[in-house]
UniProtKB/Swiss-Prot annotation:
Topological type in the membrane: Multi-pass membrane protein
Protein name in the entry: Photosystem II reaction center protein Z
Organism: Pelargonium hortorum
GO terms under biological process: photosynthesis; photosystem II stabilization
InterPro entries: PSII_PsbZ, PSII_PsbZ_sf
Amino acid sequence: MTIAFQLAVFALISTSLILLIGVPVVFASPEGWSSNKNIVFSGTSLWIGLVFLVGILNSLIS
């Protein structure tokens, strides 16, 4: 269970860093938002899901 928790935290941190860099790049590009909004929404949904997963796994471990 600890390995699953560690992998979930790593995935959350990785997704956060990707979104931290990717979202401003999408907004700065000329037609970035209209062509990449599905990717941004998918990444945001993944991030929210990982936050809940880490919370659930944390409650099971402690």
